[in-house]
Design a protein with these regions (language model features):
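RNase H-like two-metal-ion nuclease catalytic core shared by retroviral integrases
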Residues: 61-63, 149-151, 157-161, 171-193, ...
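Active-site beta-loop-alpha junctions of metal-dependent nucleic acid enzymes
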Residues: 98, 117-140, 156
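Short small-residue beta-strand/loop micro-motif enriched in glycine and branched aliphatics
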Residues: 112-116, 172-174, 198-199
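Basic, flexible linker segments flanking DNA-binding modules
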Residues: 1-82, 232-242
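An active-site-proximal beta-strand-loop segment
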Residues: 79-114, 120-121
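Mobile genetic element proteins and their domesticated derivatives, centered on retroelements
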Residues: 4, 20, 40, 74, ...
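Hydrophobic (often cysteine-bearing) scaffold residues that line and stabilize catalytic clefts
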Residues: 16-17, 36, 70, 83, ...
Length: 259
């Protein structure tokens, strides 16, 4: 039980059973603890350490505007290398002083959060600052890159699209407001909020910023991902030759992006 609690304190209190078993398996061997996955699950259940499922959805998208809306360039396609496709989204963070907002730019292949910005407004500059950080953090700046988002006014604003295009980035957007059209970004929002405490009402913006910084670091460098064959985003991003097969079973055959 101590190993489980120590790992969750380090990586995230909502880390599930499969990831726990995978990460702790060598520790069990080192301490001569003989336990299989099913028995480990029973142990978690017995001690009420299984993570309950949660569900919620609140929109932060306002697509009723006159700005140009771009075509969806990635429909039914998946990336095959880092910095081929970035996905962006905004999520709200509750504080005792009112809502703050967290803009994220994530690499769709490695799942690494490339840039982020937290503030008490949803102006275009929130997203532009996150994108600027992502561009600064590029490891492969000569690679062609698509930026995919919903049709929110921040992403359609010429101040944002022109900044992206000036940096060699091609814009792509969802066809309609449906979170499943930007599923990678939505999933990351959910993970940060539910696994790293950003779902709760936080005392103030300074504390929210500190928690966001810590959450992004853990997410990128310490947390394993089913979609990366239980690898860590930073490792996959640094090593583009590493090809992974998603741990999740997916019956949909999608073509690879060709840019």
């Amino acid at each position: 039980m101590t190993m489980v609690k120590d790992y969750r304190n380090k990586v995230g209190s909502k880390t599930g059973g499969i990831k726990l078993y995978t990460e702790l398996k060598q520790d069990f061997v080192n301490q001569d603890i003989k336990i299989g996955r099913d028995k480990f699950y029973c142990f978690l259940r017995l001690h009420k350490l299984l993570v309950p499922k949660t569900k919620n959805y609140i929109t932060t998208t306002n697509s009723k505007h006159m700005f140009k809306k771009y075509k969806n360039l990635i429909k039914d396609q998946v990336p095959n290398r880092p910095e081929q496709l970035w996905v962006s989204d905004i999520t709200y963070i509750k504080t005792q002083n009112g809502h703050n907002y967290l803009a994220l730019v994530t690499d769709a292949y490695s799942k690494q959060i490339m840039g982020y910005k937290l503030d008490n407004h949803m102006r275009t500059s929130l997203c532009t600052d996150a994108l600027a950080m992502a561009i600064k953090n590029r490891k492969y700046p000569k690679q062609k890159l698509i930026h995919h988002s919903d049709r929110g006014f921040q992403y359609c604003n010429p101040k944002y699209t022109e900044f992206a295009e000036q940096n060699g980035i091609t814009m792509s957007m969802t066809e309609q407001y449906d979170p499943y059209e930007n599923a990678v970004a939505e999933r990351i929002n959910r993970t940060l909020k539910y696994e790293y405490g950003l779902k709760q009402t936080i005392k103030n913006t300074d504390l929210a910023q500190k928690m966001a910084d810590e959450a992004v670091y853990i997410y990128n460098h310490l947390r394993t991902h089913f979609s990366l064959d239980l690898r860590k985003p930073a490792d996959v991003h640094r090593n583009p030759d590493i090809k992974y097969k998603s741990y999740r079973k997916n019956k949909v055959n999608l073509t690879e992006l060709t840019i």
